[in-house]
Amino acid sequence: MLNLLLLALPVLASRAYAAPAPGQALQRVGIVGGQEAPRSKWPWQVSLRVRDRYWMHFCGGSLIHPQWVLTAAHCVGPDVKDLAALRVQLREQHLYYQDQLLPVSRIIVHPQFYTAQIGADIALLELEEPVNVSSHVHTVTLPPASETFPPGMPCWVTGWGDVDNDERLPPPFPLKQVKVPIMENHICDAKYHLGAYTGDDVRIVRDDMLCAGNTRRDSCQGDSGGPLVCKVNGTWLQAGVVSWGEGCAQPNRPGIYTRVTYYLDWIHHYVPKKP
């Protein structure tokens, strides 16, 4: 089944910058059809940086506890990256302009992760020190296990990724936001089978995944690992983690996210429920 799925999805792409490892061609990178985020919004958004000629943004993430960041496994695994070459930047309006990079003490990749398309595309980063929570920087709320995020619910995805297929976010690199509707998994799966070489009995969109977006609005390369959030009864809940898709805002190819409720037990094995 694994080989069948990998062979059947040759053009899907995960949404992270930098050369992907074998089988990781599907990661996501940017916001298509969105606009610059207001400075007062999305205080849990973080940027993951890797040391190159400078500390380069390569993925997003979310602050779920003063000392823990939630991101996509394909950003930091399956082989754990060198901690010395990894940093976290908390919420900033423009990349690189007021960096205060934080070191990471531990990377935990879900043990079942192999590629984003197979699932379990989720990872945790433990910061060396807890951050000071403020109105500008604070945690996002994880959903209760019972939350389903029904089809059509308007949600938001944020990041500093590409603004279109193969079109990088230009300076001054503002944080972007876009509203996307939730889509039922079985409808999303049917859409991904259109024009694909997979049989209808092969599940492309799995139970631990969540679909959102349309042909005008989507996440894209560079947004990988970032949060998909939905407002439920006045509280922003993180429904998903940007994972993969085919192109960005393409017909019949919604964005695919790791479903956070599916992994709550795993998350709370490491992350305290209360700071």
UniProtKB/Swiss-Prot annotation:
Domain of life of the native organism: Eukaryota
Catalytic residues identified in the record: 74, 121, 224
Intrachain S-S bonds: 59-75, 155-230, 188-211, 220-248
InterPro entries: Peptidase_S1_PA, Peptidase_S1_PA_chymotrypsin, Peptidase_S1A, Trypsin_dom, TRYPSIN_HIS, TRYPSIN_SER
N-terminal signal peptide: 1-18
Propeptide: 19-30
Cellular component terms per the entry's GO annotation: collagen-containing extracellular matrix; extracellular space
Family stated for the protein in its record: Belongs to the peptidase S1 family. Tryptase subfamily.
Name used for this protein in its record: Tryptase beta-2
GN (gene name): TPSB2
